[in-house]
């Protein structure tokens, strides 16, 4: 057995989750860790691997302006720009491992930097920056109403809203999320050629101006228990269309988040929990 591990590399990790959106988190600050998409796929398998929605890498910052660098990989091995639930777990990991003692930190990502603020040990506030409603070239979409777009799907025109929270989101308003065909529609929209890099698809049920329910199909993953950036995107759409107030409780399958946005020209904030599950190590 010892000979089996002799030429393999040992990697320590933590298993964490934010509203049951679960992650494998690796500290890469002192030791560079390179995992191929093939290895990430194997590790993400819930039957033969660790099992997770996303892999998070904690890296040292390459700038004096930020404290750490945050990298995210989906279960299929593709690197993505953003993960809101992951950001809270990333912050908690830094606290638990003694990597920071600050109450507020700034982290760089593949796109815009994020500010993470520790309200309590397990309740974390993230500045997700201002939502971007103009990130797509919408020439291929029919402009129906202000910020409403029509996508042809299975011979029908589906009305949706597009917004970026550092990653792309398609928001569909429904009367009830209970029977929404999340995986069927989500998979079809994700593969639509107008989204060459894919898109996260969310189904939003507005209960009142301060409370929504949400189900999410994450690109390259499928339906998940929760998605922080999707919650931000859905609330941003609702506020932009004057359907929601500036503070909204978002009820996802895995739990609840609070999203705060004062409107255009201001950053959007996400408040929610993060949980450490266990520590472990693997040989690859």
Curated annotation (Swiss-Prot):
InterPro entries: DAP_epimerase_AS (IPR018510), DAP_epimerase_DapF (IPR001653). It comes from the Bacteria. The record marks 169, 218 as: Could be important to modulate the pK values of the two catalytic cysteine residues. It is found in: Cytoplasm. The keyword Chaperone does not apply. The record marks 278 as: Important for dimerization. Keywords: Amino-acid biosynthesis, Cytoplasm, Isomerase, Lysine biosynthesis. Substrate binds at residues 21, 54, 74, 84-85, 167, 200, 218-219, 228-229. The keyword Protein transport does not apply. Pathway: Amino-acid biosynthesis; L-lysine biosynthesis via DAP pathway; DL-2,6-diaminopimelate from LL-2,6-diaminopimelate: step 1/1. Coiled coil: none annotated. HAMAP family: DAP_epimerase. Belongs to the diaminopimelate epimerase family. NCBIfam families: DapF. This is Diaminopimelate epimerase. It comes from Buchnera aphidicola subsp. Acyrthosiphon pisum (strain Tuc7).
């Amino acid at each position: 057995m010892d000979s089996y591990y002799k030429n393999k590399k040992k990697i320590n990790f933590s298993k964490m989750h934010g509203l049951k959106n679960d992650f494998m988190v690796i500290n890469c600050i002192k030791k560079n860790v390179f995992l191929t998409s093939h290895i990430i796929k194997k590790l993400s398998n819930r039957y033969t691997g660790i099992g997770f929605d996303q892999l998070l890498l904690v890296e040292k910052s390459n700038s004096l302006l930020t404290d750490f660098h945050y990298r995210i990989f989906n279960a299929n091995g593709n690197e993505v720009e953003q993960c809101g639930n992951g950001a809270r777990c990333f912050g908690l990991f830094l606290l638990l491992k003694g990597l920071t003692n600050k109450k507020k930190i700034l982290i760089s990502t593949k796109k815009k930097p994020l500010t993470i603020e520790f309200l309590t040990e397990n309740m974390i506030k993230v500045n997700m920056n201002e939502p971007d409603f103009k990130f797509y070239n919408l020439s291929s979409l029919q402009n129906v109403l202000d910020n409403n777009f029509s996508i042809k799907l299975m011979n029908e025109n589906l009305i949706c809203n597009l917004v970026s929270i550092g990653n792309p989101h398609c928001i569909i308003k429904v009367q009830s999320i209970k029977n929404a065909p999340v995986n069927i529609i989500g998979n079809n929209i994700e593969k639509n050629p107008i989204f060459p890099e894919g898109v996260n698809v969310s189904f939003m049920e507005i209960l009142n101006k301060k409370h929504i329910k949400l189900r999410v199909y994450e690109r390259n993953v499928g339906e998940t228990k929760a998605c922080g950036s999707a919650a931000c995107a859905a609330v941003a759409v609702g506020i932009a269309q004057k359907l929601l107030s500036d503070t909204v409780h978002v009820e996802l399958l895995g739990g609840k988040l609070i999203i705060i946005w004062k409107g255009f020209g201001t950053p959007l904030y996400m408040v929610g929990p993060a949980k450490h599950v266990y520590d472990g190590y693997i040989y690859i």
